Amino acid sequence: MSEYLFTSESVSEGHPDKVADQISDAILDAILTQDKHARVAAETLVNTGLVVLAGEITTHANVDYIHVARETIKRIGYNTSDLGFDAKGCAVLVGYDKQSPDIAQGVNEGQGIDLNQGAGDQGLMFGYACDETPTLMPFPIYYAHRLVQRQAELRKDGRLPWLRPDAKSQITCAYDSETGLPKRIDTVVLSTQHSPDISHDMLTEAVIEDIVKPVLPAHMLTAETKFLINPTGRFVIGGPMGDCGLTGRKIIVDTYGGAAPHGGGAFSGKDPSKVDRSAAYAGRYVAKNIVAAGLARQCQIQVSYAIGIAEPTSISVDTFGTNAIPNEKIVELVKRHFDLRPKGIIQMLDLLRPIYTKTAAYGHFGREEPEFTWEATDKAAALRADAGL
């Protein structure tokens, strides 16, 4: 049988871009704890010994931004100067402005041309789900996330004390060309920062035996599966000392690993009035419920918005030939069962809560945590009944 390959990557919480994402979302959560209607667009830059906080924030909350940044860095594991970046010693610069009043009047209810709560910007967002894994996520990104989660677990509990916070993973999966389903794992790449006193051979054996094999399904590993562990041979310098990190630079890691398109808007540091974030979460919720309902084995939804306008400017669905009913019918069901106006999304998914720091590493989707309301399949039964299936 013919097959094709598809690859997705993930990065650990200690990757510099993810450090920035987590600081941005920790600041968002600290603000939402005091002021759930705050407007937040918190951007972060991290580099050797330096954190820069900038963006637009309008709130009555009183937050010690420097303390939040340091505590986030400490939790991730950068707590010694040996790593070139540590929570106590780094400089933190703060430069937040307020949200533009021109934008605010389009988002605030009762202001602007559309008196409903309008979208915070124009843009397009995608949601996706498929039946490749129990959480209805694509196989490669799901397991790429699990690998770096396992790396962090073994680092933090001391079982592999030579591990350091920065790490990356990559899964190449072979798919059956006829069924479109995962067939075998072709290649596993895992690069992890480490202390200088561990040999490459010892590191490779420990990573394969203690990180890779406990995570990946044994039946998907074959004699031909390639394991590429720290393929440069050395990864001592890492984190913000090795690379500058920025909020919003891992948007494919955050979503579907390239298995679905991305509208381009990042998530972290943005309050839910920003449809870049909230509508992408709603898109995942819609797509996952469509697949869970058996309306399709694979579903991609696109929604788009105009700044200041509540109703989406478009809703479209693609099921890649796996649909049980016509796509046009699915779009009708989406409009009946899901309120995709910004305020409707916020209420539907209960988004005015300090839940976002947890989303900022290991993927925003495919994690069935209690806070991740967009992962629920509570609409599936109603969709299936309304579809007549």
Curated annotation (Swiss-Prot):
Mg(2+) binds at residue 17. It comes from Laribacter hongkongensis (strain HLHK9). It holds the Pfam family S-AdoMet_synt_M. ATP binds at residues 15, 166-168, 234-235, 243, 249-250, 266, 270. HAMAP family: S_AdoMet_synth1. K(+) binds at residue 43. L-methionine binds at residues 56, 99, 243, 274. Its EC number is 2.5.1.6. PROSITE patterns: ADOMET_SYNTHASE_1 (PS00376), ADOMET_SYNTHASE_2 (PS00377). Its cofactor is Mg(2+); K(+). It is found in: Cytoplasm. Pathway: Amino-acid biosynthesis; S-adenosyl-L-methionine biosynthesis; S-adenosyl-L-methionine from L-methionine: step 1/1. Catalyzes the formation of S-adenosylmethionine (AdoMet) from methionine and ATP. The overall synthetic reaction is composed of two sequential steps, AdoMet formation and the subsequent tripolyphosphate hydrolysis which occurs prior to release of AdoMet from the enzyme. This is S-adenosylmethionine synthase.
